[in-house]
A protein has these predicted regions:
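N-terminal accessory targeting/assembly segments
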Residues: 1-187, 191-196, 207
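Carboxylate/His-rich catalytic cores and anion/metal-binding grooves
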Residues: 193-197, 203, 259, 266-297, ...
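N-terminal pre-Walker A segment at the start of P-loop NTPase domains
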Residues: 208-243, 278, 286-291, 295-302, ...
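Glycine-rich phosphate-binding P-loop
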Residues: 242-274
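Flexible beta-alpha connector loops of hexameric P-loop NTPases
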Residues: 300, 310-331, 363-378
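Conserved alpha-helical scaffold flanking the Walker A/P-loop in AAA+ ATPase domains
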Residues: 329-341
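Conserved P-loop NTPase nucleotide-binding/switch module
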Residues: 341-385, 389, 402-408, 412-429
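Conserved NTP phosphate-binding and transfer environment spanning the P-loop NTPase/kinase superfamily
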Residues: 387-393, 399-572
Length: 572
């Protein structure tokens, strides 16, 4: 390890030379209070910025152990430190001049959700803080401008580090509130199954967002108020008593007129699998961590998935116990999404009729009379929903506005009226008595087969030059194969997409052997992430600055949408 004086001397030596001479700076340098590491140097000023990290020892940082002793506390603190550093870095961005990306200083941009990221990591055993950033090394044309880089590394970065990574320079009360909030959120999530609940929405929550693509709360948005019949009161470790709507396990139907807040409530529940920052409005909207949003995905590929619970006796004679297609219909794709969700270990489905295949969701009495059951290969979801709960322990929340077919089987019915929820279970059930109930198959479906084994791909073995590119939250490309993720609505951040790409790449190189099934492979990936770190999947210090931990459900979904993956299904 070299000293900061040696780095300054090195910069002076390479000043005004060709840009490739910046490669000489790669290495570690001891600065007062931290170690600066230049991990990867960009090829030219117009390329992706250089990767730089700082390591502050726990003793120097001085954070009390109770702020990072548990996982939820540590993630909350990491998130806050990253936000603090990012705000400081924005003040200095591009103050160092030059061509291309010269002078850029950036870290991961955190949204409303609190995610575990590779950009800031605290070691629980000693409190050491590792923060990764990207810096555009300055140049005039393609000639090194070392004096401008000196400003960044010796003035701007030290100020950001001292202002955001040293406990003595931060608001201790604010940090305590952030960690307390995380502990309260985690307490609610653990309390849900004990109370027979699958979700909780606190009174006073603000669910509407600022506008369509914004995730920030709407100003003057109507505060949520639970119906009295559904109110639950919890005693939180820090906030104390909190009251809100408890969504009970089973089948819950959300109804109401258009634009009255049905989908807004469902969207809040979708993202309630993550903790949210203070002031978001959804801090105390907590959903079962395994919840999966279901929808139709016309055109997606399906490989060796047992969809016989919903689809059988196809006219072309295709086997639905090991179904394959490169271009699924809406109903077929939604059936596959249900089975894959079960395989991924979900305990809760979230469904909006607006994004569902109608023929998958319901089949009314008139249609059943005209097209007899034996002529219809699709068993609609309404005929399996009770079975999913009683035999698999999977609760379902459905948003519906056009059909009352689910009134008969719902355990709880909530009407959204101008963003205010009302319990209309008794009223709706009484009205439903005047309408015929949809028949349910006498025999439950056979348990789906999940023993899908990926075949190894020789192109990945021993190959360290596998290219990967992400396109926001939409997709990830591995070599020339694009994995379409745009319909996975619970992906909260593009950095989770990057992590999913690395999960697939790591599995192809190290885990897929033609023997392990998909469940075992995802188990091992989670083990690597939990016991080592997400950065371990990269196998390189130059690519670990922009990932966020994805859920198990999205890891499965990514493999399921990877068209280049070849699966074999073994039956006992």
């Amino acid at each position: 390890m070299q000293s900061e004086a040696e780095l300054r001397s090195l910069l002076s030596r390479i000043d005004h030379r060709g840009y490739p001479a910046y490669k000489d700076t790669k290495g570690q340098y001891r600065f007062p209070g931290y170690v600066l590491s230049i991990d990867h140097v960009q090829g030219d000023p117009f390329a992706s910025p250089s990767k730089v990290s700082v390591l502050v020892s726990g003793k120097t940082a001085g954070f009390p152990q109770e702020l990072y002793c548990g996982k939820c506390q540590r993630i909350a603190l990491q998130d806050e430190l990253l936000r603090q550093f990012g705000r400081r870095a924005e003040r200095f961005a591009f103050k160092a001049k030059g061509s291309g990306k010269s002078g850029l200083i950036s870290v991961s941009r955190c949204g409303q959700e609190v995610l575990e990221r590779t950009a800031c990591q605290i070691q629980p055993e000693n409190g050491n803080i590792l923060l990764r950033m990207e810096i555009g090394f300055p140049a005039n044309g393609r000639t090194i401008n070392a004096r401008e880089l000196e400003k960044i590394l010796f003035d701007f970065v030290p100020e950001c580090v001292k202002a955001s990574l040293f406990y003595k320079n931060l608001d201790a009360k604010r940090l305590r509130r952030i960690v307390d909030l995380a502990e309260d959120q985690e307490y609610i999530r653990k309390e849900l199954p004990k109370r027979g609940l699958c979700a909780f929405v606190a009174n006073g929550s603000v669910l509407p967002r600022e506008f369509g693509i914004s995730s920030r709360p709407m100003r003057d948005g109507i505060a949520f108020q639970s119906p009295k019949e559904q109110e639950v009161t919890l005693e939180l470790p820090h906030k104390g008593k909190i009251t809100g709507m408890g969504i009970r396990k089973g089948i819950t139907l959300i109804v109401g007129g258009g634009y009255h807040g049905k989908s807004t409530l469902l969207k809040a529940l979708e993202l309630g699998v993550y903790n949210h920052i203070a002031g978001d409005g959804r801090e105390y909207v907590i959903t079962d961590a395994t919840a999966v949003k279901l929808r139709a995905e016309d055109g997606r590929s399906i490989q060796k998935t047992d969809i016989s619970m919903f689809i059988n006796d196809l006219p072309n004679g295709k086997d639905t116990t090991s179904f394959c297609t490169e271009d699924a219909s809406g109903s077929t794709s939604q059936a596959a999404n249900v089975i894959e969700g079960i395989e991924a270990g979900t305990s809760m489905f979230l469904i909006d009729e607006d994004t569902s295949a109608t023929n998958f969701m319901i089949r009314d009495e008139l249609m059943q009379r005209v097209i007899h059951r034996e002529m219809e290969p699709i068993t609609p979801f309404i005929e399996r929903i009770r079975e999913l709960y009683e035999n698999y322990g999977i609760s379902t929340v459905i948003v519906a506005g056009s059909s009352g077919a689910y009134f008969h089987i719902a355990d709880s019915i909530i009407q959204m009226d101008r963003y205010v929820p009302k319990d209309i279970t008794v009223l709706a059930k009484k009205e439903a008595e005047n309408f015929p109930q949809i028949s349910v198959p006498e025999q439950p479906a056979e348990k789906p087969t999940y023993d899908r084994v990926p075949r190894p791909d020789k192109a990945f073995r021993g190959n360290d030059r596998i290219k990967m590119k992400t396109m926001g939250k939409e997709s990830v490309m591995i070599n020339r194969d694009t994995i379409d993720l745009r319909y996975l609505e619970q992906i909260a951040d593009s950095e989770q997409v990057a992590a999913l790409g690395y999960c697939v790449r790591y599995a192809q190189k190290h885990l897929i052997d033609g023997k392990k099934n998909l469940i075992q492979i995802v188990d091992e990936l989670e083990e690597v992430i939990q016991n080592k770190s997400l950065a371990e999947l990269c196998e390189s210090t130059s690519s670990v600055s922009c990932m966020a931990v994805p859920r198990r459900q999205e890891i499965f979904a990514c493999f399921d949408r990877y068209r280049a993956l070849r699966l074999v299904c073994y039956r006992s």
